[in-house]
């Protein structure tokens, strides 16, 4: 559950991601939550969602995140149907910058899709939702991600590294320009 919150003194808006501990344990998502928190906490890049703080109480874990008021690219495409080549180039340029940064930290994002690219108040595209991200120094064999965006290496279980993010980038770029999946 993500809700809008406001800093008491500065009145600046933030997104508050609340995750119930019971559901985290039931879904065996402890590692995913810890990874997301750790990865976002170390990220300092203008094209990656900023984390402002984390906390927990007896029942829930909270991430205080940068508020991205522009929605996601999926919503933008629902409104506009397609993006022209200039818009697509701009958003994909932001995404490539984000991926290059994430990959420089030996992290594979592994869930690149329209819904995980959100727009800030200035119209820049940012990478969000690091729940499936993983530090990859060699190959990993976990089957994960959204099926429509999965690279063949993931689907076939041959092992993959951060290069799978570029397959998903190609699918995303195609969807921006043609409002449909290439497959």
Tell what function each PLM region has.
Residues 53-54:
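A short, aromatic-enriched beta-strand patch in the conserved N-lobe beta-sheet
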Residues 74-83:
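AlphaC helix of the protein kinase catalytic domain
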Residues 13, 18-44:
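Conserved N-lobe beta3->alphaC-helix segment of eukaryotic protein kinase catalytic domains
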Residues 97-107:
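Protein kinase catalytic-loop region centered on the HRD/HxD motif
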Residues 91-92:
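Activation segment signature within eukaryotic-like protein kinase domains
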Residues 59-72:
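Conserved short submotifs of the Hanks-type protein kinase catalytic core
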């Amino acid at each position: 559950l993500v809700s809008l919150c406001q800093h008491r003194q500065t009145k600046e808006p933030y997104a508050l991601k609340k995750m119930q501990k019971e559901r985290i344990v039931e879904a065996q998502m402890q590692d995913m939550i810890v990874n997301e928190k750790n990865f976002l906490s170390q990220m300092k890049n203008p094209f990656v969602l900023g984390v402002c703080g984390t906390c927990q109480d007896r029942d829930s874990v909270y991430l205080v995140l940068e508020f991205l008021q522009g929605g996601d690219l999926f919503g933008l495409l629902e409104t506009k149907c397609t993006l022209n080549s200039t818009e697509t180039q701009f958003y994909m340029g932001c995404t490539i910058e984000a991926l290059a940064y994430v990959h420089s930290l030996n992290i594979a994002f592994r869930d690149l899709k329209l819904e995980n690219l959100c727009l800030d108040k200035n119209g820049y595209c940012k990478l969000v939702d690091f729940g499936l991200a993983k530090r990859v120094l060699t190959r990993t064999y976990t089957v994960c991600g959204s099926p429509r965006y999965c690279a063949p290496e993931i689907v076939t279980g041959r092992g993959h590294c951060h290069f799978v993010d570029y397959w998903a980038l190609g699918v995303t770029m195609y969807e921006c320009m043609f409002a449909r999946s290439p497959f």
